């Protein structure tokens, strides 16, 4: 089987939506029965985004095998059935790290190590490795054409097109086609210059995706085709839409998938997008609306919580409920009090690191618990719920996490000192260990307690969810908290770690150490988020009586 590659680049400006466009195209090709995957090549020097600020970079998406990756991989998994892995995302930093390690070992036999061929060869090897076993691989190059950082990646894919053959490679370029209100027309010149930039490094785009706030007229698309040396049917208009799940249908309506299948000589049936049509229908026709407050530390950049926001929307789809998400800075809870939490139908506290804003999160968990407001805590959101319960119910005054107060009297959350690495080897770690790549990461098994709420929601005795944390519930102090009424609803597969807690005699209070948002999709949803949104709707109805 020959693997076909579609290389996706962007020009003119950043944040054009390459990831969404690539994922949408992959969804159409998958609907035609093809085995599809997507890769993201990031040009920054960090080895991975694990230690980057969420406010700068956005969310870190965790794959099943424990890779800390770009948030675009979350889009990929929400659009196609293929699960991402560490093979689907790598950075300049990772490539250089690998090449330098080989140089130190003497693998290059004394050669002068250079960008070409050593760096470009390493990039090509990883792309080919990631594409094994698939009919079509979409490879998204991060950044914008013209950036100095992305040049090695662009050179590598140029070489791949020559080596693999143009019959099995395609270049798809996204550009901005701005609308000028003064003249009442769209402008194609930025696109022409962007293509010129690509041509200067030896890449002729085969497909142009024209991003605009409105449909690009046929005459303007013809003009772009003429000046950019691209077939007119390969110039695609991608206007702004009110739902990203409409994009597969928008691309299909312009024959993009037919053009690609013909170019690759792929004989496959027409795409059936009925599942996406159902998602769009549910999204457009809710029967009610709820307001859910998300109290976090990084709310100034919503992309820091991208998967959580999408998972809440998916939970709404499963209940035919429109979810209005109110982003609340946890530090505002500290300074302004719980007044800003009133009027919400449910409260979610997501993950995070560091002490800033944590007391506001603890106050939030207490407010939800004492006022019977549905509460979902994720990662840090579980830890603050535990701290609240320890302080205010179990009489453990000033209980805290050793992450925030190392010498606190009641360290109910503490660092796990023994970890297993990606090869299953036990490693001993401490507060002085490296921050990067030293967490409990990836899919882990969790055993659910029979009479728990989560057991009903999942309808399964054992589940697998993804983790990203280095602190856990301190088992040494757990009995005192359980004696005060807190229920442990889920434990790790080896029964050593607390994974889920619930507050009995509360309508809906669930907190988990894992990240359920990473496995939620628009077509399937997720049991926790579906149950959470349903609880918010029921709470709203009770309040209205």
UniProtKB/Swiss-Prot annotation:
> What is the disulfide pattern of this chain?
none
**Name of this chain's protein:** CTP synthase
List ligand-binding residues for ATP.
15-20, 72, 239-241
Cited InterPro entries: Class_I_gatase-like, CTP_synthase, CTP_synthase_N, GATASE, GATase1_CTP_Synthase, P-loop_NTPase
Q: Which residues form the active site?
A: 379, 515, 517
For this protein's source organism, the top of the classification is: Bacteria, Pseudomonadati, Pseudomonadota, Gammaproteobacteria, Enterobacterales
Species of the source: Escherichia coli O127:H6 (strain E2348/69 / EPEC)
Positions annotated to bind UTP: 14, 187-192, 223
Q: What is the activity regulation entry?
A: Allosterically activated by GTP, when glutamine is the substrate; GTP has no effect on the reaction when ammonia is the substrate. The allosteric effector GTP functions by stabilizing the protein conformation that binds the tetrahedral intermediate(s) formed during glutamine hydrolysis. Inhibited by the product CTP, via allosteric rather than competitive inhibition.
* GO terms for cellular component: cytosol
